[in-house]
Amino acid sequence: MALLQFGGTLAPKLGEKPQLLPRSPALTRVIYADPRFLVSKSGSGGRLKHLVSPTASLQSRTSSRLFNHAPSPRFRHRRSSRFIVRADADFYSTLGVSRNASKSEIKSAYRKLARSYHPDVNKDPGAEQKFKDISNAYEVLSDDEKRSIYDKYGEAGLKGAGMGTGDYSNPFDLFESLFEGFGGMGGMGGRAARNRPMQGDDEAYNLVLNFKEAVFGVEKEIEITRLEGCNTCDGTGAKPGTKPTTCKTCGGQGQVVSSTRTPLGIFQQVSTCNTCGGTGEFSTPCNTCGGDGRVRKTKRISLKVPAGVDSGSRLRVRSEGNAGRRGGPPGDLYVFIDVLSDPVLKRDGTNILYTCKVSYIDAILGTTVKVPTVDGMVDLKIPSGTQPGTTLVMSKKGVPLLGKSNARGDQLVRVQVEIPKRLSSDERKLIEELANLNKAQTANSRR
């Protein structure tokens, strides 16, 4: 590694000549590329504090302001007017370990964080970037040579020595290589995991029942449309007679890494390969299913609806949903119940409500009336002296308890006493006689 002399300072040459922004004969600042680092020297007695990559120019208004104005709170003041801008990334902080941590401690910290932030487990928007940062940090700190250079010169020193982070074409490679032999991660990452059989999606069906069907249950034949395995390709999605090849877009990884250069450095984003859909393989698609391995078909199935369901009830029929991919198990069928209302009977949980109208004469003298129930017409005795609004209970005439057909609710009958607005002369005469009799009885009771 060549050394360049600038005044009283020797600076290693990391690929290109450092840029000089002299402000005065007594103050010379050596600037290297990574915008996160500024290397400064004041006077002839100063010494080089950090090495960084020479890829960015500070010949701009932004850079000029750095030297012509007071430093921001991010700058740490030193003697002899020296200042240092620290890098935002710290591999030790990323893994949550101290700078003197052992390799086993670093490995343990990485495994714990990688499990938490792996995109297959953590769906937060920033989890994928966090996972990449963790992988980069572990890649450096787990290698003795890289760690030594990083401790001395930072990340830029690794770049200058041709040992930058990102040696793995995909951060998932590092993750998989570390967890290989530990029983896997339950389907997290990796082409093998992404090629595993996948369970099919659930299918939904809306079923409308009348009032009595919901109360007592019914057996219905329904017609559903769902995805079933393609018979032409046996569910592989590949054209018969052809063999899958490694995807050229992702190199068989199932994921691609896109890099974007910004003023703050190079940002990388990992995404599923659009060419192979994350499988890492490319096949000539089947002419029947278009490469999906499944086709949509219609099927009639017999459904037994239990007694006691209500609007909003959901029935689950196992393995009657959409077929899985690559030979995976099918999903389930969920049947959502909607119950039509009855014009006479109302439902309240497992109880049935009914309003019975009786004349004031029947309410006074008592009577027997026929009342509609889910079991048919039933005689109900109205006791004499029944008051308006009285509720009579017809035991076990309600809705069966869902899952326990031998247990039923009640039918609650609310008595509505009808008082006539008009009376005949004979009716009025009789009621007046009754009123006079009532007055006489009241007067006698007060004596």
UniProtKB/Swiss-Prot annotation:
Similarity comment text for this entry: Belongs to the DnaJ family.
Source organism phylogeny:
Eukaryota, Viridiplantae, Streptophyta, Embryophyta, Tracheophyta
The subunit field of the Swiss-Prot or TrEMBL record says:
Interacts with PCNA.
Q: Supply the source organism for this entry.
A: Oryza sativa subsp. japonica (Rice)
Where the record annotates domain J, the positions are 90-154
Report where it is expressed, by tissue. Answer: Expressed in roots, stems, leaves and panicles.
Provide this UniProt record's keywords sorted from A to Z. Answer: Chloroplast, Metal-binding, Plastid, Repeat, Transit peptide, Zinc, Zinc-finger
Residue ranges of CXXCXGXG motif repeats? 230-237, 247-254, 273-280, 286-293
Give the CC-aspect GO terms: chloroplast; cytoplasm; endoplasmic reticulum
Coiled-coil positions? none
In alphabetical order, the GO MF annotations are: ATP binding; heat shock protein binding; unfolded protein binding; zinc ion binding
Biological function: Plays pivotal roles in chloroplast development. Is essential for the regulation of chloroplast development and differentiation.
Cellular location(s): Plastid, Chloroplast
Mind telling me which PANTHER family this protein's record contains? CHAPERONE PROTEIN DNAJ A6, CHLOROPLASTIC, DNAJ HOMOLOG 1, MITOCHONDRIAL-RELATED
Q: Which residues does the record give as Zn(2+) 1 binding sites?
A: 230, 233, 286, 289
The transit peptide is at 1-86
Query: This protein is called what?
Result: Chaperone protein dnaJ A7A, chloroplastic
Zn-finger (CR-type) residues: 217-298
Other facts: Plants silencing DJA7 exhibit albino lethal phenotypes, display abnormal cellular structures, organelles and chloroplasts, and strong reduction of the expression of CAB1R, CAB2R, PsaA and PsbA genes, tightly associated with chloroplast development.
Task: Report the record's Gene Ontology biological process terms.
Answer: chaperone cofactor-dependent protein refolding; protein refolding; response to heat
Q: What induces it?
A: Induced by UV and hydrogen peroxide. Down-regulated during sucrose starvation. Transiently down-regulated by heat shock.
Does the record bear Transcription in its keywords? no
Q: Which residues bind Zn(2+) 2?
A: 247, 250, 273, 276
